A protein has these predicted regions:
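Intracellular juxtamembrane helix-capping segments at the cytosolic ends
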Residues: 34, 113-126, 134, 315-328
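Interfacial helix-cap and linker-helix signal at transmembrane-aqueous boundaries
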Residues: 34-35, 66-67, 147-159, 238-239, ...
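Conserved MFS/SLC helix-loop-helix module at the cytosolic interface between two early adjacent transmembrane helices
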Residues: 58-96
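Hydrophobic core of transmembrane alpha-helices in multi-pass small-molecule transporters
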Residues: 98-112, 301-314
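C-terminal transmembrane helical hairpin of 12-TM major facilitator-type secondary transporters
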Residues: 252-258, 263-264, 269-323
Length: 398
C-alpha cells in the first residue's frame, strides 16, 4: 500500500459508513409501532427483516468483484444510496408486500453491497492487524444501531407516525453517505501489485470445492441464528416475557454491548486465534440462553443475558472475515467473503421467523432458548473439528 495513505483516517471514514448500515438492526424498535399502526401479524412482519438479511449475500458477490478490481469506494457509495432509498420508500408503503420490496429487497441489496465494500476495502489496508481493523469497523454497526434507534425515537416523538420516521431516517442516511464518501479511497486491485500473492490464495470456484469452506459456512450459520434471536426480537422478548414496559432501552443497550464486543473480540482474536475465540463466544452465548430459560420473568437476568448475547454475537461477525482470508488468502477476499456470508444469511433468514413463530404458537420464547443452545453446542463441536482439520491442510500448503 502507498505510504501516503493515512489508513487510520480511512478507518474512521469506514466506521462512519457503518453508523448508517447499523440502522438495519433498529428494525426491532420499529416492529411494535408498525404492528400497532398497520395491524400486521408479528411473524409475517418479521419476514421483512428476514428478506433483508437473506438478500444481503447476493450483492456481496457483485461487491466482492468490485473490491477485488479496485472499485471498493464505488461499491460503498452505490450500496449506501440503495440502502437509504429503501428506508425512504418504506415511508410511503401501506402494505406488507411493498415493505418486503422496499425494506427487504432494496435496503437489503444496498446493505450487502455497502457492507462488503466497507469491510473488505479497509481490511486490505490492514493486512497486519485484520482482527483489530475488522473489530473497529464493525463496532460502527453496533454504534449505528444505537444512534439510529435514538433517531427513530426522536422522529417518532415528533411525528407520531412510523412512516414519516422511516422517511426521515432514510434522508439522514443519504446525507451521511454523501459526506463521508469524500474521505474514502479504494484499495488497489488484486492484479495491480498492491496485494502480494500467497500460496493460500484461492478463487471462489476452488474455495467452494474445499471442505474448509463448508465447515466454516455451517459454523457461521449456527452462530448467527443465536445472535439474530436477540437482534431481531429483544424488545418483544423483554416486553412479553420479562415485564418490560418498553423495548427501546434494551435495543439501545444491546447495541452498545455489541459495539464493545466488536472491539474486544477483534483484539482477542489477534491474540488467541479465530477458532479458540469462537469457542469462547459460543459457550458464553450458551450460558446466556440457559439463564434466559431457567430465570423466566427475572428482569435483571434478562438484561444480563440479552446484553451478553449482543456482546458475544459481535465476535462472530469480527472473526469470520479473518478466518476466510486465513484459509483462502487476501487476493480474492472480497468475492470469497461474499460467498462465505451466505452462511450469515441462512441464520439471519431463519432466526427471526422461527423466533416469532415459536413464540406465537407456544406463548413463550423458552423453546427458542433451548433450540439455540443446542445449535451453539453443535457449533462448538464443529469449530474444534475444523481447527484440527485446517491445521493439517495448512501444514501441507506451507
Amino acid at each position: 500500500m502507498s505510504a501516503s495513505i493515512n489508513r487510520w483516517g480511512m478507518l474512521a471514514a469506514h466506521v462512519c459508513i457503518n453508523f448508517v448500515l447499523g440502522g438495519v438492526y433498529a428494525f426491532s424498535y420499529f416492529k411494535t409501532p408498525l404492528m400497532a399502526q398497520c395491524h400486521w401479524d408479528p411473524a409475517t412482519l418479521a419476514l421483512a427483516f428476514s428478506i433483508n438479511m437473506g438478500i444481503i449475500p447476493l450483492p456481496m458477490i457483485w461487491g466482492g468483484r468490485m473490491i477485488d478490481n479496485g472499485k471498493g469506494k464505488q461499491a460503498i457509495v452505490i450500496g449506501g444510496i440503495l440502502f437509504s432509498l429503501g428506508f425512504i420508500l418504506s415511508g410511503f408503503v401501506d402494505n406488507l408486500p411493498m415493505l418486503f420490496l422496499t425494506y427487504g429487497v432494496i435496503a437489503g441489496l444496498g446493505s450487502g453491497l455497502a457492507f462488503t465494500g466497507n469491510l473488505n476495502n479497509i481490511l486490505k489496508f490492514f493486512p497486519d492487524r485484520r482482527g483489530l481493523a475488522s473489530g473497529i469497523v464493525l463496532a460502527g454497526v453496533g454504534v449505528g444501531t444505537l444512534l439510529c434507534t435514538r433517531l427513530a425515537e426522536y422522529f417518532m416523538a415528533q411525528t407520531h407516525d412510523v412512516s414519516r420516521a422511516l422517511l426521515y431516517l432514510g434522508i439522514v442516511y443519504l446525507v451521511v453517505i454523501f459526506i463521508v464518501q469524500f474521505f474514502i479511497r479504494s484499495a488497489p486491485a488484486k492484479d495491480s501489485g498492491g496485494i502480494k500473492a500467497s500460496p493460500l490464495d484461492k478463487d471462489y470456484r476452488h474455495m467452494l470445492k474445499d471442505l474448509r469452506f463448508w465447515l466454516l459456512f455451517m459454523i457461521l450459520a449456527l452462530g448467527v441464528f443465536s445472535g439474530m434471536v436477540i437482534s431481531s426480537s429483544s424488545a418483544q422478548i423483554g416486553m412479553t416475557q420479562y415485564g418490560l414496559l418498553s423495548g427501546a432501552l434494551v435495543v439501545i443497550l444491546v447495541s452498545i454491548f455489541n459495539s464493545i464486543g466488536r472491539l474486544f473480540w477483534g483484539g482477542l482474536t489477534d491474540k488467541l486465534g479465530g477458532y479458540n475465540t469462537l469457542v469462547i463466544v459460543y459457550l458464553f452465548t450458551c450460558l446466556c440462553m440457559l439463564l434466559l430459560f431457567f430465570f423466566n420473568g427475572n428482569t435483571s437476568v434478562f438484561y444480563f443475558s440479552a446484553l451478553g448475547v449482543g456482546f458475544a454475537y459481535a465476535g462472530i461477525l469480527v472473526i469470520f472475515p479473518g478466518l476466510t482470508s486465513q484459509n483462502f488468502g487476501m487476493r480474492n477476499q472480497g468475492l470469497n467473503y461474499g460467498f462465505m456470508y451466505f452462511g450469515f444469511a441462512v441464520g439471519a433468514v431463519i432466526a427471526p421467523y422461527v423466533t416469532s413463530a415459536i413464540a406465537k404458537y407456544t406463548g413463550s420464547y423458552n423453546t427458542v432458548f433451548i433450540l439455540t443452545t443446542v445449535l451453539l453446542l453443535i457449533g462448538v463441536v464443529l469449530t474444534l473439528i475444523t481447527k484440527k482439520y485446517v491445521a493439517t491442510v495448512l501444514a501441507k500448503i506451507h
